[in-house]
Amino acid sequence: MKPLKDTELIITKEKKIYHLNLEKKQIADDIILVGDQDRVSQISKYFNSIEHKVQHREFVTHTGTYKGKKISVISSGIGCDNIDIVINELDALVNIDFNTKIINSNKKKLNFFRLGTSGSLQEDILVDTYLVSEYAIGFEGLAHFYRESEHIEQQMTEAFIKHSQWPKKLAEPYIVKASTRSCTKILWKSSF
């Protein structure tokens, strides 16, 4: 496999991923993603210990332990473009050798938990209600830029497009199902 070009993998002189300003050792396998920077400390204050606190631009990272388990909380800022940067850079941290710029043959998977605010269409769901979503819908078309679109719920997406009379001039929406394993972790607190 050929090394990635400098424009494909932007790292600092200190071998940190550029936007997040992080090293591999500074993140956990379980990562809570929040939009707002202030939410990072609101969550990490419940950690038993904090080993790393890093901030670069709107990206704030706290990594520590909670009940003996290593966990990170990272702010992405607002919008799917920022979340895309965060997830791609975290993936690079664990799946690319920064010295050779070659993608590892054995890829590591991280567990992401998105924690944020949402509107509701149901009257019985009040403001500030905690929810765990089984599905998410994207309107910006970002998922279509990635090869692995098997995660898109095609039948549900097509039904939504038809029902909403989605305009063809807009990016095609997509619906994805949350990881059953992740939902179970959150609902039953088996790991946290």
Positions of predicted regions on the chain:
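Active-site-adjacent substrate-binding region
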Residues: 179-192
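Metabolite-binding pocket within alpha/beta catalytic cores that recognizes anionic/polar moieties
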Residues: 2-175
